[in-house]
Amino acid sequence: MNKKLAASATMSVAMASAETRLSENITLLGVLLDKAILEVEGEEISRKIAAIRQAALRFHQTHDQQASLDLEQLLAGLSLEHTVRVVRALAYFKHLVNLAEDLYGQQLGHCQQNTPAPGMLSYTLLQIKEAGIPADTIKHLLEDALISPVLTAHPTEVQRKSVLDIERLIAELLAARAAMVSERQLARNTLLLQGAVSALWQTRMMRYSKLSVLNEIENALTYYESTFLHVIPEILQDIECDLADVLPDAALPGFLRMGSWIGGDRDGNPFVNGGTLRESVRLQAITLFKFYLQELSALKRELAVSTRVVGVDDAVLQLSKTSRDQSQHRLDEPYRLALNGIHDRLLATANTLLPQGGWVLAEDMAADPYETPEALLAPLQTIADSLRAHQGEALIYPRLGKLIKAIATFGFHLATVDIRQSSDVHEAVITELLQKAGHDFDYAGFNEDEKIGILLEELKQPRLLFSPFQQYSELVHKEIGVLVAVREMRERFGEHAVRQYIISHTETLSDLLEVALLQREAGLLRGVWGSANIQVDLNIVPLFETIADLRDAPMIMGHHGATQRHGDGQIRLTEQGEIISTRYADPVVGRQHLETLIAATLDATLFPADQLESGKRRAFEGVMETLSATAMTSYRSLVYETPGFAEYFFNTTPINEIAELNLGSRPAARKSTRRIEDLRAIPWGFSWGQCRLLLPGWYGLGSAIHHFLQQDPALKEARLAMLLEMQAHWPLFNTLIQNVDMVLAKTDLIVARHYAHLLEDRELREEIFSRIAQEHKLTTDAVNLLLGTTQRLATQPVIAKSIRDRLPYLDPMNHLQVEMIQRYRNGETDEKLKWAIPLTINGIATSLRNTG
């Protein structure tokens, strides 16, 4: 008990120290930014920025009306040029605060490592060992497991690589500062930080031109270079070490694998095609081979083990003979010589697979390329086995073990690129292929049973529909061209280069069969459909995107064997927008997030938190169904059934500016309409966040709970008890309420009303805003009732403090955004407006730390 108390006391001191450093770092970064602004912009604008920040902070601390008036007067008196400077200052300050908070999160994580808690990977691994789970069960779970973060690009991506690079440097300097003790060290660190902050201020935050798909590919690769290539092998190796007493001599399978939609996601993006897919896979492979070659070069320097000191396996001696380096000075260093030969062969592999990769080959190099990643792994494993057998176990962990894990995980492809297209595009392509193949009917006009019959019959035919001698539309050539590119990339870089074909808007079985038929046209489906020898290269993955389609999904999934199904311990999830930079720009933060993801997946499989007995579960699910139906009715009534709601949305949010002002390669909507149904989910949510309503995150819950409790007064008390029991004992419901609590903490109806005035139709504006305000009150009351407090995020004080600290600097940006959007829509043509509006979008997204 004394040890536990001592550990707890030590952790409390460490956490207090981390909080002190957070405050000091934020103050320091603010001072450095002020200095950078003063040097570049001069005293006048520097004073205005300081006055605005102080007035905003004073208003939020005291809610003083005079402070509010002072702030409004300061903002109203800004010229457009000064507005740009103020927005940049507020936005960059929040960027810097985010860096300090990320470091604080890392330090808290370090404090907790000695006392593992639920949700941490160390805690989960400890539970696995203490639970006495049979080794075979653990082994089979890990062999079947798949945890795959999938990086995506979206219309709301607002970060520039140049800015991310500088911020990464600032984060590194802040982290180094924490370990410094001498005044000289701290002074030098401060000078370096000042240089980085000044560089940040003098760097353009936003791009002049629209982001291309190639830009998005290159941006994503920076996270592999900084984080994934290093962190994922480390995690896998450390898990293997932690479980060594449970799974002795068992090599941990590479269950943590990266995915990407960038370069392969065609749904609504006309700029993605076979060429972008090839370039995505190619650039990934170049990044990967450069990493492998760098690691091998480092190993050659490090493993100068001499046979004059220790023994070595004969297999390593044989490998050493493949080296071009036969210097007399290194004849007793077989590991180094063997690695030299492996390096040459890997370089030959890179040059074969990527002839335009800029590889430098020695004139006397005559090494054969490796055919597969497994062929590369074999000699490295031979070296590891020899080291292990000859007192060299400690030499494996620092680099060789991680390189082996990296190759087993990343292969020759780095990340699996998914391809995605909408089901209506597939239908159009199949219709044209059938017509050009001589079928005198309109496939698109048939009912579902007729379509299934035609598709199954075609899948049994040995001939292809597509003919090189026929003329097709650009759409057909593009879609077939993408699948041909898939086949080429798989043949060159292995089957993991492209594995999934995702179908947006899946509604029926024919949507899946159409993709099977298209795969056949490109050589990705072989054999006779329905027979034992059928081979389908790409998993056909449906996306069910409406309530009705989700309810019909079991019928579709049950009929189609090629559909990808995920069992226990498997999850693929998309990471997009600012979430990628928030989670993965820093390798320490990236590791913490990946460990949390692994822990959650293993916990859900081995130690499910939901231990409800069946009767109680059915009762809870019945209540949830009732709440869901009422919430959906309320939400749809507002969004889809209220006359003028689309006009309200398009006028009172920055959705049009997001679509126009260079925020990504992908259009914000699938079609050029002003229909809610045609919007993408991410811009929809992003736009509501910008105007501080975050409506999709909470609207409908209040009505659902209010109706559930008030429907029958005689049952109100019992129903409330049921909801409180669900909140206390059902993780699903608890998480739902906690998430809504967080969204409400970021919502501000006073700010949102400013945006509402962008709509000139006063009657429509008041009608819709009043409905939103009424539902907001119902939802706030419901969450307060279930959580037993009126304080937002009472159980998450760190997040609550972070949000509270952001609001003073967020409100002025919202105010300025409304003003500039109004001027832009009124026809002002000053280029500074087009420059300033995206700055506010970036600053607000950065402050909210989400993009929808």
Q: PLM features: what roles do these ranges have?
A:
Residues 532-537:
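A conserved P-loop NTPase coupling/switch region
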Residues 2-456, 473-475, 569-852:
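Often metal-dependent polyanion-binding catalytic scaffolds in large enzymes
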Residues 515, 540-543, 552-553, 596, ...:
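Extended, hydrophobic alpha-helical segments in both membrane/secreted and soluble proteins
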Residues 203, 538-541:
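Extended, compositionally biased low-complexity polar/Lys-Gly-rich tracts
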Residues 344, 348-355, 416-417, 422-513, ...:
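Active-site cores of enzymes that catalyze phosphoryl transfer or operate on phosphate-rich substrates
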Residues 233, 261, 499-500, 541:
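Structural motif
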Residues 91, 383-386, 501-504, 540-543:
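Short glycine-rich or small-residue beta-strand-to-loop segments that form or flank ligand, phosphate
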